[in-house]
Amino acid sequence: MYGSCLLEKEAGMYPGTLMSPGGDGTAGTGGTGGGGSPMPASNFAAAPAFSHYMGYPHMPSMDPHWPSLGVWGSPYSPPREDWSVYPGPSSTMGTVPVNDVTSSPAAFCSTDYSNLGPVGGGTSGSSLPGQAGGSLVPTDAGAAKASSPSRSRHSPYAWMRKTVQVTGKTRTKEKYRVVYTDHQRLELEKEFHCNRYITIQRKSELAVNLGLSERQVKIWFQNRRAKERKMIKKKISQFENSGGSVQSDSDSISPGELPNTFFTTPSAVRGFQPIEIQQVIVSE
């Protein structure tokens, strides 16, 4: 009776370790226990047999930290002998859970690893064939490199090849320079000889007669005055260096004539005659 009570208690505590039907005193490892799943023999050590209790099942020395086996199934992975058919561990499988490995070992077949390329930078490769981390290169990079030589061999622009015909205007940098005809220069020189500063009315008349714009006439007078100042400065510098008569392009000018040539007196002032002032002294 004492032995039957122990059997009932131990059967409730360890449902997966009941005695085999043969009564040989060994733990049920072939699935003959009370609904428990078989446990690997490599994880447990055999317990010594006790002759004091007849029919007492031999309990394996289980780790106290592991939960008892019951209807929950085995928490252990398959034996290592089953892993020999699969390839070795890879850096890409570092984050795969153990439960997924044990539940579906057929997912890790050799064909999945054969198509993977080298993994670069320690990143996990893609699960699809031929999409490894090392082969992630932008597709348009090769096209850009191939198109760069063709860009360098481009022909010059059309306006660079054609010969520009002169139509009265030439281009210097970003501004247009007007090319005046001989008739236009002659009329402008006549007007400049009379008046160095042209009036607004006369400027509009010259623009209409010569076929120019008022802005072009104004710019011509500005340039002509600047040219005259430059010529006068050049003559003065030549006179100071030589110490004698100043030689010009047209004629020679003596030193006594310089004031008359540089500074002309108006015609109205020339008509006046000097007035003689007589002093009258009144005596007492």
Curated annotation (Swiss-Prot):
InterPro entries reported in the protein's UniProt record: Caudal_activation_dom, Caudal_homeobox, HD, HD_metazoa, Homeobox_CS, Homeodomain-like_sf, HTH_motif
Keyword Oxidoreductase (UniProt): no
Compositionally skewed regions (Polar residues) per UniProt: 238-253
A Pfam cross-reference name: Homeodomain
An example Gene Ontology biological process: embryonic pattern specification
Region called Disordered, residue ranges: 15-40, 120-155, 238-259
Annotated GO MF terms: DNA-binding transcription activator activity, RNA polymerase II-specific; DNA-binding transcription factor activity; DNA-binding transcription factor activity, RNA polymerase II-specific; RNA polymerase II cis-regulatory region sequence-specific DNA binding; RNA polymerase II transcription regulatory region sequence-specific DNA binding; sequence-specific double-stranded DNA binding
The keyword Lipid metabolism appears for this protein: no
SUPFAM superfamilies found in the cross-reference section: Homeodomain-like (SSF46689)
Cellular localisation: Nucleus
UniProt cross-references to Gene3D superfamilies, sorted A to Z: Homeodomain-like (1.10.10.60)
Biased composition (Gly residues): 22-37
Gene Ontology CC annotations of this record: chromatin; nucleus
Known DNA-binding region: 173-232
Protein name per its UniProtKB record: Homeobox protein CDX-4
